[in-house]
């Protein structure tokens, strides 16, 4: 068969296969056109998941009759002033959207430019163009797309259900609305109530308002502002506190020069920044906006314009990591649990008990048969730690359980009679008052109370100490007089012996001790006396999971996290008041103490006003 030039209609349909993948692609292209036209309000309506109808109305600059006739021609655009594709400052620039849509659907455009006495309309029916005719419309443009893929019915069988396609459309609109909080958006149709996002004020407050409207109140209340700039690149936006996570990366919204993108480089940078805060199966929620000179980024990578290529990718990645780490460190003690709203809701009874009849209050609680006995004073004697003693893991390695006298056999709450020093009440985490279930420390602050998970808090402290020691002078180690002989599966032994250098950097010296056994000769002094067998099994399991894919630095941090978990005070360990206060003070001095190495919160803070609401005092 000889080579021949394809007809224009076939060319447009081929191009439509790249540009118009599904109804959401049509909405994306048309909304981007509205944004480029300077619209301050954009209304979107869809029906049948966008297959039956899509209508986009904006109040932008509109088009003249001549521009309208040219707009549906292939590669016709008003967005490039010259031949330089390295100066792209608009969302659209290829001039393919309208002719591609018109080649596979019934396209109708009505538009009015401010210089025109009336509006103009044009229709394209599967590639067949009609003449431009007068019409009625205020300034702006209305684009309607009906019977999508009418000319290529084979494409219809690849579409999902109407509900799924409608949700994909809403996700496209959400991303564009995040990028432009100064524009009002309304999306309606699909037999659902319309959703409107009003135009927000410029700047970070307006940006956070728009993000909160779209991502929800949880994100707004836990959002951390991040910002960093170097040379011609700037990164800003908001990142959720580590306690607010998702099971996938769909909550990560990335924008480059106002363009929503999906970039593996940026996603990898986000993951690296959160590595110290989240387990591998959880993902952060962020909205990051990268701004740089258009000449430093190539947006002409894919027809859908969802991918970009950076000239200096290393700088962009470093800035994102720096911005996120700085913001997370600044809010290091902040967790989702700091807001006592969810906790108060959990405490609140499901029903209101009947109000008792008013009468004389002559009940004596001290003589009630159900009243607990008075607390018995404690005498810690020589076992007590000084109040200012450093809180070290070694002090908690298999200690004798602190003595405690319980007022009643069924009591779960142990009260210490030592009053808190006034200055401790002014500390961020207050003064320790008691311990619940040998697991949670209850501390009093000047305006409320704090409940601390002692294991999670201590785990973060030990982890940060291990990291600091590794980066400074190396982890101090203790030589065991009698080596611990640990019997393990041969596969586990091989995995551990293959990483002896990594383990040695943390003060854990092991060597082979025959088939299926290792000898532990040195352990990190920070961890005190540890269960060597349990630690080695967990390390081997995690090493098998990491493999060689992770960089050495990340593997070392995983080793540190595993060691910290094993070297921390356990739940169920009774603590003395001095020990509890020492732990609180260490938390206040430790970076990122708001969550443990697995992303769980280390403490909950309740304001006195919240507690008073529980009892109807407010």
Swiss-Prot record:
GO terms for cellular component: mismatch repair complex. SUPFAM superfamilies: ATPase domain of HSP90 chaperone/DNA topoisomerase II/histidine kinase, DNA mismatch repair protein MutL, Ribosomal protein S5 domain 2-like. The keyword DNA repair applies. GO terms for biological process: mismatch repair. GO terms for molecular function: ATP binding; ATP hydrolysis activity; ATP-dependent DNA damage sensor activity; mismatched DNA binding. InterPro entries: DNA_mismatch_repair_CS, DNA_mismatch_repair_MutL, DNA_mismatch_S5_2-like, HATPase_C_sf, MutL/Mlh/PMS, MutL/Mlh/Pms-like, MutL_C, MutL_C_dimsub. It comes from the Bacteria. Pfam families: DNA_mis_repair, HATPase_c_3, MutL_C. Keywords: DNA damage, DNA repair. This protein is involved in the repair of mismatches in DNA. It is required for dam-dependent methyl-directed DNA mismatch repair. May act as a 'molecular matchmaker', a protein that promotes the formation of a stable complex between two or more DNA-binding proteins in an ATP-dependent manner without itself being part of a final effector complex. NCBIfam families: mutl, PRK00095.2-4. Belongs to the DNA mismatch repair MutL/HexB family. This is DNA mismatch repair protein MutL. The lineage of its organism: Bacteria, Pseudomonadati, Pseudomonadota, Alphaproteobacteria, Hyphomicrobiales.
């Amino acid at each position: 068969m000889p080579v021949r030039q394809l007809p224009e209609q076939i060319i447009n349909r081929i191009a439509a296969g790249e540009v118009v993948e599904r109804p959401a692609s049509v909405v994306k292209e048309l909304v981007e056109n509205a944004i480029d036209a300077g619209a301050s309000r954009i209304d979107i309506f869809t029906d049948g998941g966008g297959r039956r109808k899509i209508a986009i109305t904006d109040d932008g600059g509109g088009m003249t009759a001549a521009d309208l006739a040219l707009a549906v021609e292939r590669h016709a655009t008003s967005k490039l002033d010259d031949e330089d594709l390295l100066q792209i400052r608009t969302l659209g620039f290829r001039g393919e959207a309208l002719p591609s849509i018109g080649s596979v659907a019934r396209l109708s455009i009505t538009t009015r430019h401010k210089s025109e006495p009336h509006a103009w309309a044009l229709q394209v029916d599967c590639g067949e163009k009609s003449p431009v005719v007068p019409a009625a419309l205020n300034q702006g443009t209305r684009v309607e797309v009906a019977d999508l893929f009418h000319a290529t019915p084979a494409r219809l069988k690849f579409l999902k259900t109407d509900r799924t396609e409608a949700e994909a459309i809403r996700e496209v609109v959400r991303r564009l609305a995040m990028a432009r909080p100064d524009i009002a958006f309304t999306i309606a149709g699909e037999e659902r109530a319309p959703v409107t996002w009003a135009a927000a004020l410029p700047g970070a407050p307006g940006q956070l308002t728009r993000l909160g409207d779209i991502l929800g109140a949880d994100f707004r209340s836990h959002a951390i502002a991040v910002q960093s700039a170097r040379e011609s690149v700037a990164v800003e936006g908001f990142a959720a506190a580590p306690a607010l996570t998702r099971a996938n990366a769909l909550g990560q919204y990335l924008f480059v020069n106002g363009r929503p993108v999906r970039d593996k480089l940026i996603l990898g940078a986000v993951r690296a920044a959160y590595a110290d805060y989240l387990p591998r199966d959880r993902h952060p929620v962020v909205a990051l906006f990268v701004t740089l000179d258009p000449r430093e980024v190539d947006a002409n990578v894919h027809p859908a314009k969802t991918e970009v290529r950076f000239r200096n990718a290393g700088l962009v990645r470093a800035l994102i990591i720096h911005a996120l780490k700085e913001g997370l460190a600044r809010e290091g003690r902040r967790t989702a649990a700091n807001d006592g709203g969810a906790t108060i809701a959990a405490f609140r009874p499901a029903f209101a008990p009947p109000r008792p009849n008013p009468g004389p209050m002559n009940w004596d609680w001290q003589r009630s048969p159900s009243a607990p006995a008075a607390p018995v004073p404690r005498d810690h004697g020589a076992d007590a730690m000084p109040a200012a003693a450093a809180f070290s893991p070694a002090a908690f390695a298999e200690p004798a359980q602190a003595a405690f006298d319980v007022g009643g056999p069924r009591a779960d709450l142990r009260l210490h009679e030592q009053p808190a020093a006034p200055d401790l009440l002014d500390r961020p985490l207050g003064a320790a008052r008691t311990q619940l279930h040998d697991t949670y420390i209850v501390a009093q602050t000047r305006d409320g109370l704090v409940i601390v998970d002692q294991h999670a808090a201590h785990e973060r402290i030990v982890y940060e100490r291990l990291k600091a020691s590794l980066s400074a002078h190396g982890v101090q180690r203790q030589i065991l007089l009698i080596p611990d002989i640990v019997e393990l599966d041969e596969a586990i032994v091989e995995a551990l012996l293959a990483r002896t250098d990594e383990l040695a950097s943390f003060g854990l010296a092991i060597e082979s001790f025959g088939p299926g056994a290792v000898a532990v000769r040195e352990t990190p002094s920070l961890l005190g006396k540890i269960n060597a067998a349990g630690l080695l099994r967990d390390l081997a399991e995690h090493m098998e999971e990491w493999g060689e894919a992770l960089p050495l630095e990340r593997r070392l941090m995983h080793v540190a996290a595993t060691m910290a978990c094993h070297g921390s005070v356990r739940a169920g360990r009774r603590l003395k008041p001095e020990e509890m206060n020492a732990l609180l003070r260490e938390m206040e001095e430790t970076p990122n103490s708001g969550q443990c190495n697995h992303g769980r919160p280390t403490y909950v803070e309740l304001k006195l006003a919240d507690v008073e609401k529980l009892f109807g005092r407010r």
